[in-house]
Amino acid sequence: MTDANHPVTDLVILAGGQARRMQGLNKLLQCFDKQIQLLKISQHFRGKVQQQWISSNRDHRIYQHVVPHIRSFKDEETGFLGPLMGMKSAWRHVSADYVLFVPCDVTYLPKSVLKKLHQSLQQHPEAEVAYVEINGAALYPFCLLKRSSLPTLSAQIEQGELSLKKCFKLMHAQAVKFRKHALIFHSINSFDELQQYKQLNVLI
């Protein structure tokens, strides 16, 4: 079952990085908040999306063991080209015309995030993407994209322009703002940050 209050949407978890700053560890399989990230994200959006996917170049069997109903795919092109490539590749697999992309390292998942992203796109018909902003910081990979964004994604990649910020500007991107008190890290970018995040959670 999916939420009937918004158009049919698929979820894609972006986990296609090289994990160089994580000492090779797959962030999606780490525990940030006493729960494996994959489970945390999957359970948060269960019943709100049609199908859940993972954009990743590794560990596909492990993902399916953790969440049996989840599906995964690799980047269309090799070379770890970043989230833009994961987004472009997704449209070859999903059937929905809207995709909610969630980075694997995000620490805070607002309860109403999907609803508010859809509302933003409905209020701004010219926009092809709405992204999350937490405590004033833009999380461009945490976004809702329309299928009509594919030509722009493809063109930017062909030109070697892999910046989400620049790409989204071409799509008339809308920011949806959230606030979270005492949030030190909105995402985890390194092994050291993960250790700090866990220590702070014990203290808070």
State each model region's role.
Residues 2-140, 147-161, 166-185, 191-192, ...:
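Nucleotide and nucleotide-moiety/phosphate-recognizing core
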